[in-house]
Amino acid sequence: VVDSRAVVFIDVLGFASLTEQYTLELEQIKVADRPLSVESLNMILMRRENPLTQVFTAFHRSLEAVIDLAKMKHLVTAVTFSDSAFIATAHLYDAASIAIQLMHYLLPQRVPVRIGIGYGSFSALRFRSDVTVEGGDHAAHFLGTGVVRSNAAESCGIKGLRILLHPSAIQHLGE
């Protein structure tokens, strides 16, 4: 039996276009991943980042901060990849709080996101990463109706920066 969860799906809008238009600055992204380093402080002060680097690093920094805060209050399972993430919590109120907080963090940084929240099953089965000199094999095995419904809410066709609820979540608003 899989417990039902409120699942948040976050997607950065326009990320494919940024990836096509701008050079991937891996060194800058690696530096941004070490927030207290001298290089990271220099990068912040110089603000020479291209939009792809800025959006990617701001998204992941903000996402990590919001998840860390949420984990202090309740159980959270988060799966992040590229320009999107799924976050599962036990209660809709917690999921909505995460979505609102993330939107508050990202808007001033000009990182456009649309967020969908669904309610249903969620199971994180397996995560693995095998890195060798020749390459790597990475897998994130997770699934459930909460995953499908949160994605459906986000991609329902309504344009703009929004937090959208799937019908499955509406009955849990008072909880």
Please place each PLM-identified region on the residue numbering.
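Catalytic NTP-binding/metal-coordinating core of nucleotidyl cyclase/transferase enzymes
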Residues: 1-101, 108, 112
